[in-house]
Amino acid sequence: MAEPGGRGDYRKDGRLPSLSRSPLSTTLGTSPACGLEIPPTSGARPDGSCSLPAPVYHLKSRQWKGMGRGYRQRWRLQGRGDCDMGCVVQASGLFPAEMRERTTKKMATSPLDLCAGACWEM
C-alpha cells in the first residue's frame, strides 16, 4: 500500500503538483473509493472517493520503486492526445500477478477506474 504523502506525490524540486493548468480540469470525474491511501493534495475527497481525470486516459507504463514487500507501484498515465500532463497511481495488488514483473510495460487500458495519486505538468 502506498504511504500517504509519499515522495512520488511531489515534483523533483519539492513543490506540490499543480492541477491548475490541467487541460482536463473541467472534465474531472469521480472514482469510487478504492482503498488506496491518497494524500489530500491529490484530489482525494473527504468521503474516501477520489477524483480521476475523465476516462480518456490510457495506461502508458509502470515503474517499480523499491524492493521487497515494501515496494510502491507507480502507474504513469497520460491522456489520449495530450502531452502536457500525467498522473501517478500508487497501488499494489490491483493487477494480475502475471503483470507484476520488474519492468516497464506499455499497455492500452481505457477507461481506468483507478484513483489518481498525483498529477503534474510534464
Curated annotation (Swiss-Prot):
Q: Compositionally biased, Low complexity: which spans?
A: 16-32
Basic and acidic residues bias spans:
1-15
Region entry Disordered: which residue ranges? 1-49
Query: Superkingdom of the source?
Result: Eukaryota
Put simply, this protein is called Putative uncharacterized protein FBXL19-AS1
Please tell me the species this chain comes from: Homo sapiens
Which gene name belongs to this protein?
FBXL19-AS1
